[in-house]
């Protein structure tokens, strides 16, 4: 590999730095974000509707409860079916011809996002039914989730930690197992491949660090504002840019993959903490219902990048919070030095009265329950709010917008099958041109096996880039750089299996005749 831009962009050090910086940035923005301390109800666009639709705001009547459950169950079912057959197969596979979605690749991630979409749609259908009744306005589904912002942000922080850690670990695991950069980390690779080192390290580090992370986040054991003592305090503009760069880094992790944007390589990425690059779950076979036996198959690469796109949802919500942040909407106000204070008493948060949510009012009025000023009972944050205009804050989305454009550009121009390649989605990346005889033409060749098959390898059409493998069964042309003993073995195995499949019915027919 020549030492060009791609060499350095996809270098192991570059990939590992980006993967681990995302973890640090996510913790930093969680600590600096004033929303993380807000006592008001959390609201998340679309996701909040889905969460509220499934988990809370159930009417008292049994009939209404049954209706609601049936609607969100129907939404999940339709979402799974539409995600698999409409979005994955039709839209991504046939219409857009995206290589990364060939066969069943990426189907579970597509089905997940499709399910969210249909839960959102059915929540509005449910709202329409409630409005028709006239007396059910209190049970309307909105993007408010029924939990406090503080609790939701803690859950989001733990979720992003898990997702970012698994992603960073898989990047590290890949760097230490594969060999596109053979001169990098020789001693580390030798240690990594010894026995079960990578397996033991993963589970040990995961349980240890996750226990510490959950303990610190959920118990407020460590206070960031007491720890940093106001060192380089952030404002809404700097936090918006930080959230934007987190989105950029999420996309960079995917774009730095050696097989981006097609993901059609022959490198199997082992799942973290396991010896296998994929997991299979057998669905119970009911012959009366299903005509075939179905299995759930999850590959390491889609397991990794599927998690990234889930984390991307939380990061987008974090970016939204910074861009449209207004202190009074989150039960907060601005004190001296443009510092943010968080109101903790529930009485002041009932109506979010802007008069009571101010430094002037809370510093001059006494709480009768504590005989102290309201300010003394509020939480002081070193984070600042300078009142920047929306235009200035929206500039923070420019880096993310550029990253999304480049991401789409590479997929559109380099990650799609050509029109004349339609129908080749199921072929291996080494496929160039294939001509097969019908198996019926070989039904007379009884007893032909792999051992007595004659195979010749020649140069087709005087093109040194191609190698032709011709056997008694068929002819296949490979790119010479991809020709391996495994390809040759697979080619012969596929050829003989087709003949054997046709021989078996013929043999059975002769037995019945005799």
Swiss-Prot record:
The modification Phosphothreonine is found at residue 453. Its main location: membrane. Keywords: Cell membrane, Glycoprotein, Membrane, Phosphoprotein, Transmembrane, Transmembrane helix. Residues 430-450, 494-514 are annotated as: Disordered. Residues 37-65, 132-154, 220-239, 317-394 are extracellular. It is a multi-pass membrane protein. Residues 1-15, 87-110, 176-198, 261-295, 416-514 are cytoplasmic. One of its GO terms (biological process) is intrinsic apoptotic signaling pathway in response to endoplasmic reticulum stress. Pfam families: TMEM117 (PF15113). Glycans are attached at residues 353, 371. One of its GO terms (cellular component) is plasma membrane. Residues 438-448 have a biased composition (Basic and acidic residues). Belongs to the TMEM117 family. Involved in endoplasmic reticulum (ER) stress-induced cell death pathway. This is Transmembrane protein 117.
